[in-house]
Structure formats: C-alpha cells, structure tokens
C-alpha cells in the first residue's frame, strides 16, 4: 500500500493524459458532427467565443472528473484532476504559447504531476 501511495501521482497524471486522448478521439472522431452542432448551439446561448471556449473547457473537465473518479474510486481525485487539467488548458491558451501536440501533452503531464506530488507530499488525505 505504501508503494501505491508513493506513485499515485504518476498514475493520476498518466490516466489524465489517457483521458484527454480518449476525450479528443471520441469528440473529434466519433461524434465530430454532433460536437460541431453542439458548439453552434452553445455559441448562440453564450453569445461570445470566449464564453464558448470556457464552456467547452468546463465540459471537458466534467468528462475528466467522471472518468478519473471511476478509475480511482475517489471523487476528490476526480475533482482535483479536472480542476488542474482545466487550469493548465486555460493558462496555455491565455498565455499564447505555441506548442506541438506532444509539447502540449508534456506541459499537462509535467504540471499535473507536480501538482499531485505537492498535494500528496503535504499529506492531504485522498
């Protein structure tokens, strides 16, 4: 059990990366037409591109929350993973940094790993 807790941050970061890939492949592959129509409906509701983008990021965070909560059987891990993933996405877009897809994935993995290492180092219960 001690080994599991010491490397839990790594598992969370890996499954969050896998979750992001699953989200991309499902939404832009399997449901691309629906996703585009949904974006049009949401844009009409929120009336600005920035709000549309924030709604998109929030919906993606919900996807990560559900998936990671199920995988780790922990609502806390699901919530924290979704929040840190959304925060990295928001920061990356606002900062204007141009990254390749691999660079973007590395940015997420690094920040999310550091976040969970610090969280577990602080001794917070999961």
Model-derived features: where do they sit?
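Transmembrane helix interruption/hinge and helix-loop junction motifs
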Residues: 5-8, 69-78, 123-125
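Cytosolic, membrane-interface loops and tails of multi-pass inner-membrane proteins
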Residues: 17-50, 92-96
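Hydrophobic core segments of alpha-helical transmembrane domains in multi-pass membrane proteins
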Residues: 9-17, 74-88
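Juxtamembrane boundary at the C-terminal end of a transmembrane helix
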Residues: 116-126
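Core segments of transmembrane alpha-helices
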Residues: 53-69, 107-116
